[in-house]
């Protein structure tokens, strides 16, 4: 017998999201590797910023640096800003059962922005460093304002908030 899950009763997973600005003020984005859950998604909407879960007892800033390295190989960064608030999104119904073992209804994210101070050769996504699982198959630098138009629809409102929050970050570098 199938168990019916009330997804609205599930908690949000605590995560971090990371913006990395280059010296021109552009932001690093990666294109998600295709999975079964992406089967009906427009390929032009598979771009996203690095993000990931916060481990038990881990500080959000430490999770941000760890996730950035695990997903991109980037370590040469300088912190610019931490978002004041947490931003959250719900997983769409069609992804339920495909993400995080149905333990969460969505994610609540603390966002950070960093200045990239390294060399392009530091960026390694497929495979990423230390045997981590690849999450991206391509990457590029884009204008911050472009972000909401290149992500999946259920994250668009969060990316709009992120753009507003970090819009002036590059001016203070």
From Swiss-Prot:
Matching InterPro entries = Nudix_hydrolase, NUDIX_hydrolase-like_dom_sf, NUDIX_hydrolase_CS, NUDIX_hydrolase_dom, RppH
- CDD domains xrefs: NUDIX_Ap4A_hydrolase_plant_like
**MF terms per GO, please?**
bis(5'-adenosyl)-pentaphosphatase activity; guanosine-3',5'-bis(diphosphate) 3'-diphosphatase activity
EC number of the protein: 3.6.1.-
The UniProt entry annotates the motif Nudix box at: 52-73
Sorted UniProt keywords: Hydrolase
The reply to whether Hydrolase figures as a keyword in the UniProt entry is yes
Q: What cofactor is needed?
A: a divalent metal cation
The residues covered by the Nudix hydrolase domain are: 11-164
Which enzyme type, at the first EC level?
A: hydrolase
> One Pfam annotation, family name?
NUDIX
Q: Which domain of life is it from?
A: Bacteria
Q: Name one GO biological process term.
A: nucleoside phosphate metabolic process
Q: Spell out the coiled coil positions from the record.
A: none
Q: Which HAMAP family match?
A: Nudix_RppH
Which PANTHER family does the record associate with it? NUDIX HYDROLASE 26, CHLOROPLASTIC (PTHR11839:SF22), UDP/ADP-SUGAR PYROPHOSPHATASE (PTHR11839)
NCBIfam families, alphabetized: PRK00714.1-5
Query: Into which family does the record put it?
Result: Belongs to the Nudix hydrolase family. RppH subfamily.
Q: Briefly, what is this protein's role?
A: Accelerates the degradation of transcripts by removing pyrophosphate from the 5'-end of triphosphorylated RNA, leading to a more labile monophosphorylated state that can stimulate subsequent ribonuclease cleavage.
This one is known as RNA pyrophosphohydrolase
Recorded source organism is Bartonella clarridgeiae
């Amino acid at each position: 017998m199938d168990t019916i899950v009330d997804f609205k009763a599930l908690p949000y997973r605590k995560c971090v999201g990371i913006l990395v600005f280059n010296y021109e003020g552009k932001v690093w984005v990666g294109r998600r590797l295709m999975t079964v859950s992406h089967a009906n998604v427009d390929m032009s909407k598979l771009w996203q910023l690095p993000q990931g879960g916060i481990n038990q007892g881990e500080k959000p800033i430490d999770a941000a640096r760890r996730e950035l390295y695990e997903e991109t190989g980037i370590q040469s960064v300088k912190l610019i800003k931490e978002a004041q608030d947490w931003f959250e999104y719900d997983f769409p119904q069609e992804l339920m059962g495909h993400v995080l073992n149905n333990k969460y209804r969505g994610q609540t994210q603390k966002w950070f922005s960093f200045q990239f101070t390294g060399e392009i050769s530091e960026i390694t996504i497929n495979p990423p460093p230390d045997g981590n699982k690849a999450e991206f198959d391509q990457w590029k630098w884009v204008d911050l304002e472009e972000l909401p138009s290149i992500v999946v629809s259920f994250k668009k409102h969060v990316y709009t908030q992120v753009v507003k929050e970090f819009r002036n970050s590059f001016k203070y570098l």
